[in-house]
Amino acid sequence: MKTFKKATSILLILGMMATAVFMTGCSTKDPANGKTVVEIVQYKPEAVKAFEALEAKFNATHDDIELVIDSPNDAMTVLKTRFIREDYPDIIGIGGDINYSNFLDADMLMDISDYEGLKDIKESYLKTDKELEFVPMEGIYAVPYMANAAGILYNKDIFEEHGWTIPETLDEFYKLCEEIQAAGILPLYFGFKDTWTCLAPWNAIAVDLADSDICAQVNAGTAQFKDAYRPVAEVIKSLLAYAQPDPYAYGYNDACTAFARGESAMFVIGSYAVPQIKSVNPDMNIDSFVFPACDDPEQNVLNSGNDLQWSVMAGKEDKKEAIYEVLNFLYEDENIQTYLDDQSAVPCKKGDFQLPPMLDGMKPYIEGDRMADYQDHHYPSEMAVDAMIQTYLMDDSANSLDTFLEKFDTEWIRYNRDLIAKVQKYYEEHPNELLEGGE
């Protein structure tokens, strides 16, 4: 028996599963029609129509493979239940976040280094997945498919009316906010009543001011958050001077509605908010720009992470040829565009794709592969970092910054004690690989 490492509720349930179960599951051939059945379970139910169209298109053009794509409302719960029954899909479509890290740590995914389509994926998104490994691993275990982008959405009509230009440094951003205030307009609107929205500006600032692998450095014992996150925490709190009074009284929907109605010129949030905003004001002219947290414009990067990526479950080697054929189909340019048109996402594949207009200001970063992942993709959910940030923002005491940063380090150790021990043991055995300074 092999005991899986526990990190999420899924893995707690899986804890005592034997490695051999990966060799069981659905048969390769459907006895009814002799086709090889490839089943995908993906976690984005909002994209169900796009995947239904892709499934139908694939099955209409392939005689020897039948593709089945399931898009349940709570994919992680569905997967957990199926894993208990030892009923594994062939491919899972999940985000590049802590769940992916835990699946990797539990040896649940197949090494797909030999998949030729990897050469067409932007390097930043491949790097993102490597940084999600708790300890360095040989091989590649996911193919990034779609990403999202976060920064600052702005009302393009208001900007053009006043002749405001897009800031490229933090000082320029502060000056812009002051100009907007002088015009009698609110620069920013926040929905901090919903604590998760505190992570939007946090992530957008952190990609510029903190190393992308800072969490790995902390686990390795070569860095502390109290140093790495100090400038991030200082900048996020400075934004309150340009927002509505008591932003903790308003939630995400309130902020989307206020921005849609022109109550603020800007909204620090991801591109995922645009459909909600457009539901209030379908004709709103929205564009976006990268949060300019650096003094040097060349050092600014786009906050963009793997929103959807494909991993093959371990033990599916007998289906590998059919699985790779499905992946090839999904990565055909016209099929990627089908998803983009439906979901307003960012493609992880290199190529000339038509992006939604609200990403125009971010195109240079997307096309130049100048991107870094969301810091919160490395945070354990039980640590509730979003609530910690909200508490810090509400704290007006003189020592609020130090209190917050010290708590971040303390809570990180509390919720990652076993992981830290594992990582530090690894680097004791592999001292030449020790992480320092964003390596």
Annotated model-derived regions:
Residues E179-I180, V218-Y248:
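Glycine-centered hinge/linker elements that transmit conformational signals in sensory
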Residues V135-Y145, A150, Y174-G221, S264:
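Extracytoplasmic/periplasmic solute-binding protein
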Residues T81-R82, P89-D90, K119-D157, L186-F190, ...:
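A structural signal for short loop-to-beta-strand junctions that line the ligand-binding cleft
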